[in-house]
Amino acid sequence: FWRVISDGSDVIGEEFDLAVAYIEGASAYYVHDHVKSKKKVGFIHIDYSKAGYTRKTDKNCYDDFDRIFTVSDEVKECFISVYPELEEKTKVFHNIIDEEKIISKSSEKMKYKMSDKGIRLLTVGRLTYQKGYDVAVYALKELVNHGFDVNWYILGDGPEYQTLAALAVKEGIDSRFHLLGAVDNPYPYYKAADIYVHATRFEGKSIAIQEAQVLGCAIIASDCSGNREQINDGVDGILCGFTPAGIADGIEKLITNPALATKFRMASAEKQINHLEELQNIYGMMR
């Protein structure tokens, strides 16, 4: 859609040293079609083929890019499966986050209060089909049916809001499935959550998981590309099947085994993040 409507846009008159398409799709198309620069860089954040991108829709825009960065090894493999001829100029560039800022802001007051009773689950991300919140509704219902006192908090806006709210009402768990919308500071919620759940249909490399690890969360994630590079199953989290039963079973394991949850929290907090290589990649493009 963006490629169609951008065809009539004017080319920016000024020439830049470096133009960066921060994400696949609209950003990449705009940089290719309308920005003049000595060098161009594109970032890929998602499993390219599963996200619906094709060579036909791209119109080979990436041929014009000097470097393509993917956020994980698996994302790189998926992109190269679509563009094998671009392998030489495709490199991995891991997400950069500010750990000190995240830890500092996690002590601030929450905009919305979380329940003091039962188990607090948290998921952060846009309300889209990819993120799998519809399956989360059914997983929560299974947990409630199994007798667990659980509240699931969702931070994020998106096109699925009304559909998810209606589904929660239909399944009778709307008092426990809390669609809080986007908040300026999500970090106190990570800190207060008992378990962070990231059960998505497909993924690139999740910044939300990185943030949860910085704040020492016990994490459950679906076993898909991206998540597999961030979670070592059984060591610092659980990789679960992307079904209501699979997600519910993973959550139950942590609820009924507090020692395991503690182990995962400690392992998450101990993860070391080094951004030096990523920064050198960007600096190298400006030489």
Q: Which residues does each predicted region cover?
A:
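Short hydrophobic beta-strand element within catalytic cores of glycosyltransferases
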Residues: A218-A221
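C-terminal alpha-helical cap of glycosyltransferases
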Residues: Q272-R287
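Conserved acidic donor-binding segment of nucleotide-sugar-dependent glycosyltransferases
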Residues: D233-G234, I238-A245, K253-P258
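A conserved mid-protein helix/loop that constitutes part of the nucleotide-sugar donor-binding site
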Residues: I119-E142, F148, P159-A165
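Aromatic "clamp/platform" in nucleotide-sugar-dependent glycosyltransferases that forms part
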Residues: A182, R201
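Short acidic/histidine- and often glycine-rich active-site loop of Leloir-type glycosyltransferases
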Residues: E211, D223-G234, I238-L239
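Carbohydrate-associated surface elements
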Residues: E74, I96
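A short, well-ordered alpha-helix in the C-terminal region of glycosyltransferases
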Residues: G246, L260-N274
